[in-house]
Curated annotation (Swiss-Prot):
The keyword Transferase does not apply. GO terms for biological process: photosynthesis; protein stabilization. GO terms for cellular component: chloroplast thylakoid membrane; photosystem II. It comes from Calycanthus floridus var. glaucus. Its main location: plastid. Residues 1-12 have a biased composition (Polar residues). The chain crosses the membrane at residues 41-61. The gene is psbH. This is Photosystem II reaction center protein H. PSII is composed of 1 copy each of membrane proteins PsbA, PsbB, PsbC, PsbD, PsbE, PsbF, PsbH, PsbI, PsbJ, PsbK, PsbL, PsbM, PsbT, PsbX, PsbY, PsbZ, Psb30/Ycf12, at least 3 peripheral proteins of the oxygen-evolving complex and a large number of cofactors. It forms dimeric complexes. InterPro entries: PSII_PsbH, PSII_PsbH_sf.
Amino acid sequence: MATQTVEGSSRSGPRRTLTGDLLKPLNSEYGKVAPGWGTTPFMGVAMALFAIFLSIILEIYNSSVLLDGISTS
């Protein structure tokens, strides 16, 4: 037999901690899906703005052709 139970063991289940008690409400919504699109449009806008930001940083770093008409000093 792979597992063995000991009768009369004093194991009472999972141990409660302060951190666990603080984080428990955050996990109570696990698996629930909001109806409709939810915050998807906001996430799309955030991703687009981040992509624009990254392309600007890359263009500045590479001294890209797109920035030839813009003086940086």
